[in-house]
From Swiss-Prot:
Ranges annotated as biased composition (Polar residues): 315-326, 370-421, 429-472
Name of this protein: Envelope glycoprotein
Gene name, Swiss-Prot/TrEMBL: GP
Superkingdom of origin: Viruses
Cleaved signal peptide residues: 1-33
Keyword terms, alphabetized: Clathrin-mediated endocytosis of virus by host, Cleavage on pair of basic residues, Coiled coil, Disulfide bond, Fusion of virus membrane with host endosomal membrane, Fusion of virus membrane with host membrane, Glycoprotein, Host cell membrane, Host membrane, Host-virus interaction, Inhibition of host innate immune response by virus, Inhibition of host tetherin by virus, Lipoprotein, Membrane, Palmitate, Secreted, Signal, Transmembrane, Transmembrane helix, Viral attachment to host cell, Viral attachment to host entry receptor, Viral envelope protein, Viral immunoevasion, Viral penetration into host cytoplasm, Virion, Virus endocytosis by host, Virus entry into host cell
C-alpha cells in the first residue's frame, strides 16, 4: 500500500514543474478556445477589432445608408418640356412608397398642378407625411391643362419621384419633387450624439432671403396638353408676359432672359398677353451644370445687348393657332457681336478699351459731353470694334464703301440702316411703359456720335422711342455720350453681378459634378461635404449620427452612373438586381444578429469577413462579406423555448470542447508522469 502510494506520489520539484506546465496549457487553451458567448467589453472593443481586422474597409451593414440620388447628374435634360416627356399616366397600377435617410441637393425640382378640360384634377393629393423635396436650387412650378389619360402619373423609365425622405412612384399634386433613385451609400463610422434632440420641424426651402445658404428660385410655367404627344409650354415672366419654349434650355437662361426683359421694359402693360418667341440663333444653354451655394455660378452669360425685340402681330380674336384675344406676338432675335474681348483689359480702366478700339487720336470726354463731333476715325481699323456693352455694339456694314471720310456724323445725321435695325417703332406702342423716367438714371444727356460703319444698338433706339423721340430727332436726347455711356456700361460688364464662392468648372461630357451635397433633418453647421444623417432604429429615437462625406472626384460620377443603370433596370419599382442586393443586406443583418452572441462575423471568420468595394464607377458594392459586431452582454431576446434551448446549450459547445481538452491533457500528463516515475 505504501509502495503504491509512493509510485503515485510525484517528487515535490517535479510536481511544481508539472503543475506549472498544466496551468500554462490550460491558459493557452483558454485563450485560444475562449467561449465566445461570454466575451465582454473588458476583453476587446469593437473599435479595436475594426483596427485589427477590417481597418478602413467596410465593417458593418450599419455603414450603409439609403440615399436619394438625383437623375440630373446623368446629363438628362431638365427643362420642363423635356422632363414632362419622361412622365406618363397609367391606370390600374398601385403606387409604391419607400423611405430613404439622406438626400442629395437637387438643381431642378418640379411642382405640378394640372387640370383636365372639365376642371377636375389630374394628380392626387399627397398622403399624410409626404412633404416636398427640401433642397432645390430651381423649382419649376407648372400650371396648365391636359388630357391626363390615366389615374396616376408614373415615370416612364421606372425612376422614383423623390420627396422629403420618401420616394414614390407617382406624382402628387402641388408637392415639390425631383427625379431620382434610392441607393445604398457607404459612410464612415459615425459618432453618436445622445444629447441632440429630434428636430421639431423638417427642412424647408428658403425663397425670400437672398443671403440664405439654401436660396431657392421658383420659375413659373403654363402648359397645355400635358400628358399628350404635343404639348405647349410658356415661361411666365409676369401675369401678361410669356416666352414660348420650343427647345431645351437651362434655368439660368430663363433667369437671365427674365432679367433682360424687365431691364429693357419689354413687358406687357395692358390686360392683353404678350408672348415672345426665341430666334433659333439664340443659344439657350448659357448656364453651367454645377451645384449651388448661395447663388448660381455661371460659365457664360446671356448678353442682353445682343438681343433685338420686335413686335410681329396682334390678335384681336381667336384664330386658327388658338391665340387668345388681345394677344401680342413678339420675336426676340440675336445679333452676335464681333469677338473682341481681348480689347477689354481687366486690369486697367475701361476707358482704355474705348481709346484702343480703332481710333487714331485720343477721345475727349468733355468734347462728347458738350455735343461735339469726333474726328479721326479711319476706314481700316473699323474691322475691329468695341467690346460688347449693354448699350452699344459695333458691326461692319458691307454696303459702305471701303474709303470713308475722316469726319463723323452724329445720330441725327446718320440714322441706323434698315438691315441692322429690325424694330418698328410704330408697333412698340402695345408694350410701352407709362413710367419711363426710371428706366435710366441719367435725366439729361447728349446724343452719341457714330460713324457710318457703326450701327446703333436696338436697345438704344428702343429707349429713344419710349421717350417719344426717333433716331432722326435730337430735341430730347435719351442716352449719355458715347464715352460716358460706354465706360459706365463696360465697367458694369466687367464687375461680377453674382457672388461666386467656388471656381467655375467647365462642362464635361457626362456632366458629372464631383461634389457631394446632402441634406437631412439636422441642418446646423451645414458645411459643404458634411452629411448629417439621422439614425433610425430600435430604441434609437433622438440619436443622430454625424457622417463625414469627402468630396471625391470619381465617387459622385460613379454613383450617378450606377443610378442610371439602376434606373434602366427598374419597372415602376426596384427590379431583380436591387431586390437581390436588398435581400443580401437583410441576410447579412440576420447573420449579424444571430452571431452577435458569439462575437460577430468578424470575430469568427477573421479577416475573411472584410471586403473593399472594387469599382466605384460601376456600382457601390458587388457584395457584402463583412459585418462588424458591437459586443453586448445582454442575451438574445426570448422568441420561444426552442430558441432559448438552442441558444442555451449551443453557446457552451466551444467551452465544453475546451474543458474536455483540458481533462484529456491532465490525464495524459498523469499517465506520462506515472510511466516515467
Amino acid at each position: 500500500m505504501g509502495s503504491g502510494y509512493q509510485l503515485l506520489q510525484l517528487p515535490r520539484e517535479r510536481f511544481r514543474k508539472t503543475s506549472f506546465l498544466v496551468w500554462v496549457i490550460i491558459l493557452f487553451q483558454r485563450a485560444i478556445s475562449m467561449p465566445l458567448g461570454i466575451v465582454t467589453n473588458s476583453t476587446l472593443k469593437a473599435t479595436e477589432i475594426d483596427q485589427l481586422v477590417c481597418r478602413d474597409k467596410l465593417s458593418s451593414t450599419s455603414q450603409l445608408k439609403s440615399v436619394g440620388l438625383n437623375l440630373e447628374g446623368n446629363g438628362i435634360a431638365t427643362d420642363v418640356p423635356s422632363a414632362t416627356k419622361r412622365w406618363g399616366f397609367r391606370s390600374g397600377v398601385p403606387p409604391k412608397v419607400v423611405s430613404y435617410e439622406a438626400g442629395e441637393w437637387a438643381e431642378n425640382c418640379y411642382n405640378l398642378e394640372i387640370k383636365k378640360s372639365d376642371g377636375s384634377e389630374c394628380l392626387p393629393l399627397p398622403p399624410d407625411g409626404v412633404r416636398g423635396f427640401p433642397r432645390c436650387r430651381y423649382v419649376h412650378k407648372v400650371q396648365g391643362t391636359g388630357p391626363c389619360p390615366g389615374d396616376l402619373a408614373f415615370h416612364k423609365n421606372g425612376a422614383f419621384f423623390l420627396y422629403d425622405r420618401l420616394a414614390s412612384t407617382v406624382i402628387y399634386r402641388g408637392t415639390t419633387f425631383t427625379e431620382g433613385v434610392v441607393a445604398f451609400l457607404i459612410l464612415s463610422e459615425p459618432k453618436k450624439h445622445f444629447w441632440k434632440a429630434t428636430p421639431a420641424h423638417e427642412p424647408v426651402n428658403t425663397t425670400d432671403d437672398s443671403t440664405s445658404y439654401y436660396m431657392t428660385l421658383t420659375l413659373s410655367y403654363e402648359m397645355s396638353n400635358f400628358g399628350g404627344k404635343e404639348s405647349n409650354t410658356l415661361f411666365k415672366v409676369d401675369n401678361h408676359t410669356y416666352v414660348q419654349l420650343d427647345r431645351p434650355h437651362t434655368p439660368q437662361f430663363l433667369v437671365q432672359l427674365n432679367e433682360t426683359l424687365r431691364r429693357n421694359n419689354r413687358l406687357s402693360n395692358s390686360t392683353g398677353r404678350l408672348t415672345w418667341t426665341l430666334d433659333p440663333k439664340i443659344e439657350p444653354d448659357v448656364g453651367e451644370w454645377a451645384f449651388w451655394e448661395t447663388k448660381k455660378n455661371f460659365s457664360q452669360q446671356l448678353h442682353g445687348e445682343n438681343l433685338h425685340f420686335q413686335i410681329l402681330s396682334t390678335h384681336t380674336n381667336n384664330s386658327s393657332d388658338q391665340s387668345p384675344a388681345g394677344t401680342v406676338q413678339g420675336k426676340i432675335s440675336y445679333h452676335p457681336p464681333t469677338n473682341n474681348s481681348e480689347l477689354v483689359p481687366t486690369d486697367s480702366p475701361p476707358v482704355v478699351s474705348v481709346l484702343t478700339a480703332g481710333r487714331t487720336e485720343e477721345m475727349s470726354t468733355q468734347g462728347l459731353t458738350n455735343g461735339e463731333t469726333i474726328t479721326g476715325f479711319t476706314a481700316n481699323p473699323m474691322t475691329t470694334t468695341i467690346a460688347p456693352s449693354p448699350t452699344m455694339t459695333s458691326e461692319v456694314d458691307n454696303n459702305v464703301p471701303s474709303e470713308q471720310p475722316n469726319n463723323t456724323a452724329s445720330i441725327e445725321d446718320s440714322p441706323p440702316s434698315a438691315s441692322n435695325e429690325t424694330i418698328d417703332h410704330s408697333e412698340m406702342n402695345p408694350i410701352q411703359g407709362s413710367n419711363n423716367s426710371a428706366q435710366s438714371p441719367q435725366t439729361k444727356t447728349t446724343p452719341a456720335p457714330t460713324a457710318s460703319p457703326m450701327t446703333q444698338d436696338p436697345q438704344e433706339t428702343a429707349n429713344s422711342s419710349k421717350l417719344g423721340t426717333s433716331p432722326g430727332s435730337a430735341a430730347e436726347p435719351s442716352q449719355p455720350g458715347f464715352t460716358i455711356n460706354t465706360v459706365s456700361k463696360v465697367a458694369d460688364s466687367l464687375s461680377p453681378t453674382r457672388k461666386q464662392k467656388r471656381s467655375v468648372r467647365q462642362n464635361t461630357a457626362n456632366k458629372c459634378n464631383p461634389d457631394l451635397h446632402y441634406w437631412t433633418a439636422v441642418d446646423e453647421g451645414a458645411a459643404v461635404g458634411l452629411a448629417w444623417i439621422p439614425y433610425f432604429g430600435p430604441a434609437a429615437e433622438g440619436i443622430y449620427i454625424e457622417g463625414v462625406m469627402h468630396n471625391q472626384n470619381g465617387l459622385i460620377c460613379g454613383l450617378r452612373q450606377l443610378a442610371n443603370e439602376t434606373t434602366q433596370a427598374l419597372q415602376l419599382f426596384l427590379r431583380a438586381t436591387t431586390e437581390l442586393r436588398t435581400y443580401s443586406l437583410l441576410n447579412r443583418k440576420a447573420i449579424d444578429f444571430l452571431l452577435q452572441r458569439w462575437g460577430g462575423t468578424c470575430r469568427i471568420l477573421g479577416p475573411s469577413c472584410c471586403i473593399e468595394p472594387h469599382d466605384w464607377t460601376k456600382n457601390i458594392t458587388d457584395e457584402i462579406n463583412q459585418i462588424k459586431h458591437d459586443f453586448i452582454d445582454n442575451p438574445l431576446p426570448d422568441h420561444g423555448d426552442d430558441l432559448n434551448l438552442w441558444t442555451g446549450w449551443r453557446q457552451w459547445i466551444p467551452a465544453g470542447i475546451g474543458i474536455i481538452g483540458v481533462i484529456i491533457a491532465i490525464i495524459a500528463l498523469l499517465c506520462i508522469c506515472k510511466i516515467l516515475c
